[in-house]
């Protein structure tokens, strides 16, 4: 009986050790940033920009950015 328990324990330990090697590899998609083609005016709210990029420009994400704080544009992220 002790031999059986030892064998089962060793098998379970081996399964746990080798389970880590079987983990799937996750590949992150490259995202490219470009200014929204359909946004008009200055961008003040990141949430509105993100919503606009996803719904109108079919992007993955978006946020307000730009060189001057008083005039920022909406930039969208797309899969490259």
UniProtKB/Swiss-Prot annotation:
GO terms for biological process: defense response; defense response to fungus; killing of cells of another organism. The keyword Nucleus does not apply. It is found in: Secreted. Disulfide bonds join 32-80, 43-64, 49-74, 53-76. Pfam families: Gamma-thionin. Residues 1-29 form the signal peptide. Keywords: Antimicrobial, Disulfide bond, Fungicide, Plant defense, Secreted, Signal. It comes from the Eukaryota. Confers broad-spectrum resistance to pathogens. Belongs to the DEFL family. PANTHER family: DEFENSIN-LIKE PROTEIN 1, DEFENSIN-LIKE PROTEIN 14-RELATED. This is Defensin-like protein 18. The lineage of its organism: Eukaryota, Viridiplantae, Streptophyta, Embryophyta, Tracheophyta.
